[in-house]
Regions:
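Hydrophobic, well-ordered secondary-structure segments
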Residues: 101-102, 106, 119
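Short conserved catalytic/interaction loops centered on acidic-Pro-aromatic/His motifs
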Residues: 112-118
Length: 145
């Protein structure tokens, strides 16, 4: 019996919607990363993009555990003297709420060419509407609160 290896051209792609309202950020990110990579399919092959498209809505209402809202900081550096900037999750949520989910999912997929291709299939929106109704996405139910 030969080992099966999927081909990216033969992969069937579905569209999924994850509602992040009152869901823990890590649980949303794990589910999105697994769907993006195709880990929940029987034809999963680690070096081939067999994953689906994922839409995450209500990214501004995602929940964080503990005191991360005030204590977790995002650092950036412009390259200039005195160019260090930092902001906590609360400030980041006001400016760019979708970046919280995008960064969490990005950390859970491979950091290589395949990971970049997979990451492009993630669509994150801060509101409860999205422009992908024509793709007829299916709703993903997350367990727990």
């Amino acid at each position: 019996m030969k080992t099966f290896s999927a081909k990216a051209s033969e992969a069937s792609r579905k569209w999924w919607v994850i509602d992040a309202r009152d869901q823990v950020l890590g649980k949303v990110a794990v589910k999105a990363a697994n769907l993006l990579r195709g880990k929940e399919k029987t034809v999963f092959t680690p070096h081939v993009d067999t994953g689906d498209f994922v839409i995450v809505i209500n990214a501004n209402k995602v929940r964080l555990t503990g005191k991360k809202e005030e204590q977790k900081t995002f650092m950036s550096f412009s390259g200039y003297v005195g160019g260090h900037k930092s902001e906590n999750v609360r400030a980041r949520r006001v400016r760019h709420p979708e970046l919280l989910v995008e960064r969490a999912v990005r950390g859970m997929i491979p950091h290589n060419r395949l990971g970049r291709r997979v990451y492009r299939k993630l669509k994150v929106y801060s509101g409860d509407s999205h422009p992908h109704a024509a793709q007829q996405p299916e709703v993903v139910k997350l367990t727990g609160k």
